[in-house]
Amino acid sequence: IERMDVPREYAIQATIFSEAPGGCSTGTSAAVTVALIGALDRLTPGRLSPHEVAYTAHAVEVEMLEQQSGIQDQLCSAYGGINFIEMFEYPYASVSQLHVPNSIWWELERRLALIYLGKSHVSSQVHEKVIAELEDEGPETPRLEALRGTAEASRDAVYAGDFTALGQTMVENTEAQGRLHPDLISEDARQVIEIARSYGALGWKVNGAGGEGGSLTLLCPAQSYVKRQMLQAIEDESSLFQNIPI
């Protein structure tokens, strides 16, 4: 409200709800901030573009709350859908929306699963660890190049509707995260990955900054009954593990 400079004559009551637990590594804080800024923008003279909404939300987290934050969560929330984001100079980025046939949309919805590991985390702490580890290597370090490559490969796989390639890219991304810092792949995440692997999952990705708690995204096998068995096995493994509907 302070950032948007809402006229003082307005009394504001905001109600916030999300299916995703807080600290779930799914960009919930960015999504909430984007939604509030979009709503408050209706009360102010200007009309912000999606890009402007995203950068205002980013400023709230970085400048006002003094948190470490990328810009991708805010951009995804502001634009919606599937996006390919190129960050050419932090925090500046361009957004290309991926338009795919309904058949690919529906298959993604059917195959993807979100597993909450039962503990929230503060991603800023993990960001600080990674920054400290990499600051002497520079932006062109091979460890970062590996992550950049998976973004392009996953974009191409989605366009092609190639779920095997998409799953492999998710696995490569997770392995590249682990090479950035060992703390990014927790023991709980490794447990879930092993169960998913045993059921023939095509891919798995530690979400967000990784570390303790948070969540994983799984790309499930084609057979729905195998997906159900896999999710049940994951939830049976620990009372902390929870399948979040998406």
Language model segments and positions:
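C-terminal nucleotide
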Residues: 1-6, 43, 55-68, 74-205, ...
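FAD-binding core of FAD-dependent oxidoreductases
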Residues: 19-35, 68-83, 205, 209-213
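Anion-binding (especially nucleotide phosphate/pyrophosphate-binding) glycine-rich loop
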Residues: 1-56, 189, 196-198
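Short, solvent-exposed beta-strand edge segments and adjacent coil->beta transition regions
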Residues: 11, 21, 110-112, 213-215
